[in-house]
Regions:
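Partner-binding and oligomerization surfaces adjacent to conserved cores of proteins
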Residues: 2-340
Length: 340
């Protein structure tokens, strides 16, 4: 049963037009899912450079990049065009008072305090950090990012689904990690927005008028838009078949975030230089990363290459040199032919 259905069941048998008595305990419930999760994506592949792969092996962490510094820094506001289109096409289907509550909600920045999913970090300013993966284990589109002189010097890591578990929350630091596939098609995006707006409208229409309920609906939709924006991309990128892990981090915790390995603390928030830009990121350790056997990486692919045999031999040597074991990790070569 959905959250709104549970809420409405409290007034079962009553007229749905603002007749259900409003009680403040309603405000403690979540009206919307915080994000759209597509659990059909069972395998996720992270494409990276040789240097990136070595860093992952050595530190047992993945780098999550600040959403403001992704390749297309404007992508977080892609949802705004979809919201504008949605209201243009659907405004007539809702009471104007409801429309006026949420019609103008948009993503305007990369840092906000809308995310209230984390216990005790409600209303805390947060930033979003992204790890990009693909659902395609041998994608020419993705290999091209690592192309030089006809060689594709990239590697593709199959990430075990629970390596960076979705809906994972560190209640001490306030960090949460969520996962979902990226939506490219406008029709799909419109359907996702429609489901969320309809759910809110059903609740708003059923309960008696209350300013507190109105404010709750505004907050819920603002929160939902802020997170969902990270999973909407322009249709021109659809060949990437992207799926994402997103870490949501309280801004005031960034400089103190750390993890412990062999009794030594490691800072999670750091910077690297990408195309001349100081780019912030956080290191996210694998689940169970402190064990002698690593389950996080299921396979490693080698990009299209004329010397793939040598790359495979070097990769095998590197894996054997690690101070932990990769459990049944398979190495495979791209089937895409090399062209010069």
């Amino acid at each position: 049963m959905d959250n709104d259905d549970r809420l409405l069941s409290e007034g079962k048998g009553m007229n749905e037009n603002h007749e259900i008595k409003f009680r403040e305990r309603v405000l403690s419930k979540s009206f919307l899912d915080r994000f759209y999760v597509d659990n059909t994506c069972s395998k996720r592949y992270h494409y990276t450079s040789p240097e990136g792969l070595m860093g992952i092996f050595k530190t047992r962490t993945f780098y999550f990049t600040d959403s403001q510094f992704l390749n297309d820094f404007r992508e977080k506001i892609n949802i705004n065009d979809e919201l504008k289109l949605f209201w243009k096409e659907n405004q007539k289907n809702y009471d104007i008072k409801f429309v006026n509550l949420i019609k103008n909600i948009r993503v305007t920045q990369y840092e906000d305090n809308s995310f209230s999913y984390i216990d005790n970090h409600n209303e805390t300013m947060c930033r979003y950090f992204v790890l990009s993966l693909s659902m395609n284990e041998d994608s020419l589109t993705m290999w091209k990012y690592y192309s030089k002189n006809g060689e594709y010097n990239g590697y593709c890591i199959e990430v075990f689904d629970y390596a960076l578990t979705d809906e994972w929350i560190d209640r001490v630091t306030g960090v949460t990690v969520i996962a979902s596939k990226v939506e490219y098609c406008s029709d799909e995006k419109q359907e996702i927005i429609l489901r969320s707006v309809d759910r809110l409208y059903k609740i708003w229409k059923s309960y008696e008028f209350s300013e507190m309920l109105d404010n709750k609906i505004i907050k819920e939709f603002t929160s939902w838009v802020s997170v969902e924006a990270l999973f909407f991309k322009d249709e021109c990128f659809q060949d990437e078949q992207e799926t994402r892990y997103v870490a949501i981090v309280p801004t005031n915790k960034l400089n103190t975030l750390h993890y412990t390995y062999k009794e030594k603390e490691y800072k999670m928030y750091d910077f690297r230089i990408v195309n001349g830009v100081f780019t912030p990121f956080i290191r996210m350790p694998f689940n169970y990363w402190n064990e002698e056997v690593c389950l996080a990486i299921s396979s490693i692919g080698i990009g299209p290459s004329a010397n793939s045999e040598q790359k495979e031999a070097g990769l095998e040597q590197l894996i054997r040199s690690l101070d932990y074991k990769l459990d049944e990790c398979k190495i495979y070569k791209s089937k895409i032919p090399v062209r010069y």
